[in-house]
Amino acid sequence: MKKGIARLHECMGTLFASILKGEVPSHRVASGEGWYAFLDIFPRRSGHTLVIPTRSVQRLAELTQDERSSLMDGVTEVQTILGAHFGTEDFTICVHDGPLAGQEVPHVHVHVLPRTAGDQGGTLMSMWPSTETASPDHEALSALAQLLQGAP
């Protein structure tokens, strides 16, 4: 169902652009200059909020520095709101940047999930449970870091 909704809106612009225009209802949590936050309609837990830029772009790199800064200000404000309501200072914050990363709606969005004791949420490792963890290969990590430092 969720993927079907996202695909339906791709031909008309993104689902989130339609939300921003008021064409699709949302459950607003907060908004500010350059960002809008609303409850995810398929929450992973109570309070699961999406923070989006008001300009429709698919990838973080397409936002200007000011837009990225504004988006993170929105994330921080949402954390404050959710933290007060759920009595927590702990959050899972996640961005799926592109379809291979799991992005279902082609509009940048930041997931903000309040975390509380016993919520059964997992760590990053729980996202790839079949991937074995091994001892760090510092030689390979060092080589990759050197390559990445020279990347454009």
Features from the language model and the residues they span:
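HIT superfamily nucleotide-processing domains
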Residues: 2-152
